[in-house]
């Protein structure tokens, strides 16, 4: 079916890369619209933000 074309067996975990922020330059989201698109088509997608200082 068209509504579940993105369904996966395991969840998708999105984590930002080079920057320690979820946005490039504080403006553009790192994962853009991908998490919303995936979840709207039956995929389990999670976005995680890592802090630069885990003791902070």
Swiss-Prot record:
UniProtKB keywords: Hydrolase, Lipid degradation, Lipid metabolism
Residues in coiled coil: none
GO molecular function: triacylglycerol lipase activity
Domain of life (superkingdom): Bacteria
Top-level enzyme category: hydrolase
InterPro entries, sorted: AB_hydrolase_fold (IPR029058)
Transmembrane portions of the chain: none
Catalytic activity: a triacylglycerol + H2O = a diacylglycerol + a fatty acid + H(+)
Record GO biological process: lipid catabolic process
Temperature dependence: Thermostable.
Gene3D superfamilies to which the protein is assigned, alphabetical: alpha/beta hydrolase
Protein family (similarity comment): Belongs to the AB hydrolase superfamily. Pseudomonas lipase family.
Described function: This thermostable and solvent-tolerant lipase is rather nonspecific. It can synthesize both primary and secondary alcohol esters. Simple triglycerides of short and middle chain fatty acids (C<13) are the preferred substrates.
Protein name: Lipase, thermostable
Species this chain originates from: Burkholderia cepacia
Lineage: Bacteria, Pseudomonadati, Pseudomonadota, Betaproteobacteria, Burkholderiales
């Amino acid at each position: 079916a068209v509504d579940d074309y993105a369904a996966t067996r395991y969840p998708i975990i999105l984590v930002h890369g080079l920057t320690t922020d979820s946005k490039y330059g504080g403006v553009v989201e790192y994962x853009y619209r991908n998490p919303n698109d995936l979840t709207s088509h039956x995929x389990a997608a999670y976005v995680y933000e890592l802090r630069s200082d885990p003791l902070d």
